[in-house]
Regions:
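Conserved, well-structured core domains of diverse proteins
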Residues: 1-176
């Protein structure tokens, strides 16, 4: 009964979602063989741009790992990216992560609060590199490690105030 009340809430509030219904005709179903495979669809998935300083090393890296595993793209945000996440991979021409590796083993214990086990072949590299007006963390090497560049022209969330982190979030690691 509770689930029904919650599920009908959109209809009662007259939201667009609540007024939308699918009319299915099994006779007009598209054969599964004509549907684009999920492995192709996820290649167009991308995370939002969130800087390393705005979240955590673990969260920022986990987004990159997850998107790389499915074939999508993560975005560095305007704070740049730790060169340890892409330098070795670029030099080797592919992932250098081996079985038994951990996040702190790659980045260093002083840069990780909660260690994360990695899989062989994982990539910590964000494929989308954002460049903002202050160019935090932007180097030639950083730009060369991108599959895609995103040039930020304006601040949407806090117009006129972008790129300012609360003081307690600016650690030595973030300041680098």
């Amino acid at each position: 009964e509770y689930a029904q009340i919650i599920n009908d809430q959109s209809k009662r509030h007259m939201t667009l979602r609540g007024l939308f219904e699918f009319k299915l005709d099994p006779a007009q179903a598209i054969p599964l063989s004509e549907v684009e495979p999920a492995t192709n669809i996820v290649k167009r998935f991308a995370t939002g741009a969130m800087s390393l300083g705005s979240i955590s090393t673990e969260a920022h890296t986990t987004l990159a790992i997850a998107m790389n595993r499915i074939g999508g793209k993560s975005n560095t945000g305007e704070g740049g990216e730790d060169p340890m996440r892409y330098r070795q991979e670029l030099r080797a021409g592919g992932s250098v992560i081996e079985t038994g590796a951990t996040l702190s083993g790659v980045l260093g214990r002083d840069r990780v609060e909660v260690d994360t086990p990695l899989r062989a072949g994982d990539s910590l590299r964000s494929k989308i590199k954002q460049v903002a007006s202050a160019r935090f963390g932007v180097t030639t090497e950083y730009l060369n490690s991108a599959d895609q560049l995103q040039i930020k022209m304006a601040q949407g969330a806090k117009p006129g105030e972008g790129g300012q982190l609360p003081g307690h979030k600016v650690s030595t690691y973030i300041a680098e």
